[in-house]
Curated annotation (Swiss-Prot):
InterPro entries xrefs: IDEAL_dom, UPF0302, UPF0302_N, UPF0302_N_sf, Virus_scaffolding_prot_C
Pfam families the record matches: IDEAL, UPF0302
Protein family according to the UniProt entry: Belongs to the UPF0302 family.
Superkingdom of the organism of origin: Bacteria
Protein name: UPF0302 protein Lm4b_01938
Gene3D superfamilies on file: Uncharacterised family UPF0302, N-terminal domain, Virus Scaffolding Protein, Chain A
């Protein structure tokens, strides 16, 4: 997840987006212009790839893509009425608003990438191969850390001339090395 995106970056993106893309409904353009004109609202706006799990979301589409032109939802209530969405955004300006934009080449747009955030409500899904790689990395890191700790304790046993501790730690180290193979 990237660092916080500034209000100015979000406003610049909205202006760029509206200049570059024609919305399927003019009300979508009005809502985006309203948002861009109010820093206190922009502060709570998050551009995401999907609205799954979000408590309050706005899905807008530009011409050239096959998506609903305008959807707003809050909790379990969903509407295609821009007036209701505008009213909620205006009155509840201090609530998080997740915005999903559908437009041509959205995923390859550097402007969109700059403001896009991970949806905090969507679980990260890893393929089995990725899970195995992550597990192997964790195991290797833990093993390396443990081995270094035992080596440090062996050095301390040598420094204090503690022969019993030294032999015990060498056996532990040998056992760790055999288990790794």
């Amino acid at each position: 997840m990237k660092a916080s995106i500034s209000i100015d970056e979000k406003k610049d993106f909205i202006r760029w987006f509206l200049n570059k893309h024609q919305m399927k409904t003019r009300e979508a353009m009005w809502v985006l212009n309203y948002i861009a004109g109010h820093d206190q609202i922009v502060k709570y706006v998050h551009f995401v790839d999907n609205l799954e799990g979000c408590a309050r979301g706005l899905s807008l589409s530009a011409h050239g893509v096959e998506s609903e032109p305008f959807l707003f939802f809050k909790g379990n209530i969903m509407t295609t009425d821009p007036e209701k969405a505008f009213h909620d955004i205006r009155l509840n300006w201090d609530e998080e608003l997740y915005v999903e934009l559908h437009f041509e080449e959205a995923m390859s747009s550097p402007e969109y990438a700059l403001v896009r955030e991970d949806n905090p409500f969507t679980a990260v899904k890893l393929a089995d191969e990725e899970k195995e790689m992550a597990d192997a990395l964790i195991y290797q890191s833990v093993h390396q850390f443990s081995r270094e700790k035992v080596l440090q304790q062996i050095d301390e046993a040598l420094d204090t001339r503690d022969e019993a501790a030294f032999h015990k730690l060498v056996r532990i180290l040998q056992q760790m090395d055999t288990e790794k193979e």
